[in-house]
Amino acid sequence: MTAKQIIFDEAARRKLQAGVDALANTVKVTLGPRGRNVVLDKKFGAPAVANDGVTIAREIELEDPFENMGAQLVKEVATKTNDVAGDGTTTSTVLAQAIVKEGLKNVTGGANPMILKRGIEKAVQVAVEELRKQAIPVETNKAIAEVAAISANNDREIGELVAKAMDTVGKDGVITVEESKTLHTELETVEGMQFDRGYVSAYMVTDTEKMEAVLNEPYILITDKKISAVQDLLPILEKVVQRGKPLLIIAEDVEGEALATLVVNKLRGTLQVAAVKAPGFGDRRKAMLEDIAILTGGEVVSEELGRKLENATIEMLGQARQVRIEKEKTTIIDGAGSSEAIKNRVAAIKRQIEETTSDFDREKLQERLAKLAGGVAVIKVGAATEVELKEKKLRIEDALNATRAAVEEGIVAGGGVALLQTQKAIDELIKTLEGDEKVGAQIVRRAVEEPLRCIVENGGLEGSVVVEKVRTLPVGHGFDAMKEEYVDMVAAGIIDPVKVTRSALQNAASIAALILTTEALVTEKPEKKENNPAPNMDMM
């Protein structure tokens, strides 16, 4: 076992803070309408240009192992906020930095970190409740377009596209982002279906960076059987290999020898194959497999229907233009099923919805209907260069996530204003607290003004002056950093989803409180490199 080095108390916390600052200072230059870009060096190909907090955070690895721990903890804040809300990663990083900075001052001054943590948690809870009170529901297309445009760094064109996509497939529809072969960014609606089952083995992925498997024009084998013996699969595998196309297997399960054979063939490049478990359970699983079969123009290979897997023919397999498989979901795009058969199936499901008395069944039937009839909207991103394309694609993904979050929990004034305006609620809480708990709440009160301060400073103005002025304005009014004037934020279209703002604050406080309560850091001791002395010339 390698030797470890340990540091304690103040020294440990200072190292963590240095790591937090290194990461946060890099990320926060991108915040706001006048935020700058960060260029990331790639080992292969051109450098990447990013304006997105989590993308930048993921690239940062510090040399000092203790400082690196601090940076990795804040990276966790950005990643967690991105996972939950899909946006707000820069805001959460800025908040975490502010809470750590203020908190460490107090811990150094003798405050008890555990009680500080309690105060921080209480203040965050009050702030989140206040954000929910300020929330305005998002219903119109105009509101959706504004949310999307802001998240895409004030790009109106992207805002319109996302709003149009949501309008086409509905708020629960599936929207994916692909790279276009042209210079233009456009919207395409594709008949498609998504279900919540991912690949059976991670060895099946085709894109290791995104951890997803993409099969173009695959055959699709649909069966309700558990496949473990490779003998059952061999006949159909041989037929597919002869055709030279990828294969997607949807089965109750694929395991043992059969799974090993598929993985080995995939890794050797003999056959591009992916397997997913069938969605749903019991009778609903049979119905969903039937839906997939109708959508792709295939048949369900089931012994109940007198079809054995070892006798399966190519004609029984479904087909689609593309299948995308992630860890927990699969999307079938442009199935080859006949539109007549799909129409009949949709009509049958609608009849079942009318006849059913159970709310649960109705909900599940409506889900199936949306999957069959709703389709998938594809935003095809076009740009002049590869670097611009990647940057634009990231912004569109951000905009999509922000918009979904806005539809879910509503919106509040953007530009860091809603957070600042939770201060009144926090002040009320502070009056009821005492000692270090009160100090903890005051730390959060100070931290919630940091995003606004940062946006203003990125615009080249004095943060403190603007923060003081916004404090005196009515709720929902704040500072437009683009035009440099005080406005009604919602009317001016400067808005943030509640879910994004709330997640940013909750995740930042959670990690920052961990850093404040840290008393020791343990890391591996770097091995000393031995210098081999050059041979003496006399020895030659």
Curated annotation (Swiss-Prot):
Keywords: ATP-binding, Chaperone, Cytoplasm, Isomerase, Nucleotide-binding
GO cellular component, one term: cytoplasm
Record protein name field: Chaperonin GroEL
Leader sequence residues: none
Binding site for ATP: T30, L31, G32, P33, D87, G88, T89, T90, T91, G415, D496
Enzyme class name: isomerase
Single GO MF annotation: ATP binding
Alphabetical list of PANTHER family matching this protein: 60 KDA HEAT SHOCK PROTEIN, MITOCHONDRIAL
Family membership: Belongs to the chaperonin (HSP60) family.
Compartmental location: Cytoplasm
One record GO biological process: protein refolding
Pfam families in the record: Cpn60_TCP1
Record field: catalytic activity: ATP + H2O + a folded polypeptide = ADP + phosphate + an unfolded polypeptide
Function: Together with its co-chaperonin GroES, plays an essential role in assisting protein folding. The GroEL-GroES system forms a nano-cage that allows encapsulation of the non-native substrate proteins and provides a physical environment optimized to promote and accelerate protein folding.
